[in-house]
Amino acid sequence: KQLLLDLALPAGGLNSIITSADAPLLQLLQALIAGQRYEPSLYLWGDVGVGKTHWLRASADSARAEGWQAYYIDAATQSLDDPLYEVANWLAIDNLHTLDDAGQFEFFALYNQQRQQGGVILSSGAVHCQQLPVRADIITRLQWGLQFPLSPLTEADTLAALKWHAHMRG
């Protein structure tokens, strides 16, 4: 009987992002991570399958590789109440549309703390921030930052992504 080895491949950071439609977002994230630009808040939104989670994980991986205290947090499955997040300067918080009352309180506190400390919060949700089922003060905070609707991959981008992942697997 052959046993499977659960060996995860490195995520690839922002190098794993294949996009033509969302190239301005990629360039902005690269500039933020390199310290060439500062934006305290970015909100990504779109339907299931447009890559929100991939964008957030890739940004956190790239930021961490460049010396940021960066964390990816899935608000659908993880609490935002972790002391590590208070010392972070890059938070990638996925699935804001799933925040319950306690999660909204924690997000609001983290958002204000990051802004005060000069950190970055990259967050995502299924809908535009004005349509999120969250408190009005959270919507206001998200509107202070940049907002990006993500586009589905084109056929050419999908092919390029498949080739990149095949190449990474060897």
Model-derived features: where do they sit?
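Walker A/P-loop nucleotide-binding motif
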Residues: 37-56
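Conserved AAA+ ATPase "SRH/arginine-finger" region at the nucleotide-binding site
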Residues: 145-157
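Short regulatory helix/loop adjacent to the ATP-binding pocket of P-loop NTPases
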Residues: 129-143
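Conserved AAA+ ATPase "sensor/coupling" helix adjacent to the nucleotide-binding pocket
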Residues: 145, 160-170
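Dynamic helix-loop-helix/coil hinge segments at AAA+ ATPase domain boundaries and subdomain interfaces
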Residues: 4-26
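Conserved nucleotide-sensing/catalytic segment adjacent to the nucleotide-binding pocket
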Residues: 82-125
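Post-Walker A helix-loop "phosphate-sensing" segment adjacent to the P-loop in P-loop NTPases
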Residues: 61-73
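Pre-Walker A adenine-sensing motif
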Residues: 23-35
